[in-house]
């Protein structure tokens, strides 16, 4: 008996500067539920992230399904079809609308990505979507919150106090957010406010208003020659914690210059080369949101290779509950969205747009055809 198949966006071996190595495959395998903690989700909508085009370009794995962010409906909660006997089924029964994120860009799990009709996810890292949130809004959250959760709550990263629903920080300490107008930046600003911190955003002049709308207490323009002095003045006290949502030579230089003279922690969302680490006293943490999954990611001699860490997964599970509570209470809002019509092909076209730098201040989202 043949295995069930689905439509999905998969990687190809074709390399071209003009087009990403992706195609629509209408005979991709449907992933199987792996444990009592996992559920099968029918995908309703997906969001596109820069790592989706970066990973298929630099770590190409032909025939592997792509995609991280999603919103969908639980359709199976154990190996026994629609059984509700598992721990996952008890928490998220069949028919529940959920959102979350995967990391399909590793050889260990090539048949499980969000750019597909179905995906398998650990239910402990899923968020139940309230009626007040649309499929597209919910699809935009997974990668963002999982990454921010580790940047904030991992003691080896920023190690912030408390949680959004249980704030314990009282000093209103400034936290610098470089890239405050990005999807990660606007989410970080919202969560920092809820946790009792004071987010100061670095953004372009065009994105300044957006960052302020999402909770930044003040902004500085990264193109200004006075950017660092402005940031220090806005903070009013030494900055000891910085989140860099961009992570390139320019952003690292500004962040390092803005950091307190005595010490501080710099959490970045991409690799920070040694050449950018100009002050040894500053602690650096390259945050990879996929570590909330608690599994090994093996991508050769790169910063993306990480061993599974159950402590980081525990942070992710805790934050999944936090995000759900914030969504239900109306304390969280999605980054501005731009829906791309066209289904499967729109996903590939949208990733090309991201690669070419054609998207600013918006998160690209696509509805998955319900064939």
From Swiss-Prot:
Domain of life: Eukaryota
Pfam families noted in UniProt: ADH_N, ADH_zinc_N
Biotechnology: Calbistrin A has been reported to possess a number of interesting bioactivities including antifungal active against Candida albicans and cytotoxic toward both healthy and leukemic human cells.
Pathway: Secondary metabolite biosynthesis
Major enzyme class: oxidoreductase
Alphabetized GO MF terms: nucleotide binding; oxidoreductase activity, acting on NAD(P)H
Chain sites annotated for binding substrate: 145-152, 289-293
Induction: Expression is induced in complex medium (Czapek yeast autolysate medium) supporting calbistrin production.
Chain residues that bind NADP(+): 51-54, 181-184, 204-207, 222, 269-270, 359-360
Keywords associated with the record: NADP, Nucleotide-binding, Oxidoreductase
Family: Belongs to the zinc-containing alcohol dehydrogenase family.
Descriptive protein name: Trans-enoyl reductase calK
Organism annotation: Penicillium decumbens
């Amino acid at each position: 008996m043949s295995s069930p198949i689905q439509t999905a966006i998969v990687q190809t071996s074709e390399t071209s500067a003009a087009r990403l190595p992706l195609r629509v495959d209408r005979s991709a395998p449907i992933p199987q539920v792996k444990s009592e903690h996992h559920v099968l989700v029918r995908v309703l909508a997906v969001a596109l992230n820069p790592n989706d085009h970066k990973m298929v370009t630099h770590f190409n794995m032909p025939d592997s399904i792509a995609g991280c962010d999603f919103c969908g409906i639980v359709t199976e909660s154990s190996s026994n079809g629609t059984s509700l006997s598992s721990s996952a089924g008890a928490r998220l029964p069949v028919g529940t609308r959920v959102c979350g994120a995967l990391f399909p860009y590793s050889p260990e799990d090539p048949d499980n990505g969000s750019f597909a009709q179905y995906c398998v996810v650990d239910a402990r890292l899923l968020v139940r979507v309230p009626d007040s949130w649309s499929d597209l809004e919910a699809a935009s959250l997974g990668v963002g919150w999982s990454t921010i959760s580790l940047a904030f709550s991992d003691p080896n990263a920023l190690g912030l106090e408390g949680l959004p629903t249980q704030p314990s920080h009282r000093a209103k300490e400034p936290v610098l957010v470089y890239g405050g107008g990005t999807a990660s930046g606007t989410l970080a600003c919202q969560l920092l406010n809820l946790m009792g911190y004071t987010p100061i955003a670095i953004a372009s002049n065009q994105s300044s208003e957006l960052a302020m709308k999402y909770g930044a207490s003040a902004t500085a323009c990264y193109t200004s020659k006075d950017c660092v002095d402005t940031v220090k003045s806005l903070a009013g006290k030494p900055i000891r914690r910085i989140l860099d949502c961009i992570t390139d030579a320019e952003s690292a230089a500004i962040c390092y210059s803005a950091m307190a003279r005595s010490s501080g922690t710099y959490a970045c969302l991409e690799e920070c080369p040694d050449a950018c680490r100009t002050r040894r006293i500053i602690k650096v943490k390259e945050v990879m949101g996929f570590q909330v999954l608690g599994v090994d990611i093996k991508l050769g001699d790169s910063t993306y290779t990480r061993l599974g860490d159950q402590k980081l997964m525990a942070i992710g599970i805790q934050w999944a509950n936090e995000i759900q509570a914030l969504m239900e209470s109306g304390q969280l809002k999605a980054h501005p969205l731009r829906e791309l019509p066209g289904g499967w092909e729109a996903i590939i076209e949208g990733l090309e747009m991201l690669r070419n730098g054609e998207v600013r201040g918006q998160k690209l989202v696509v509805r998955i055809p319900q064939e």
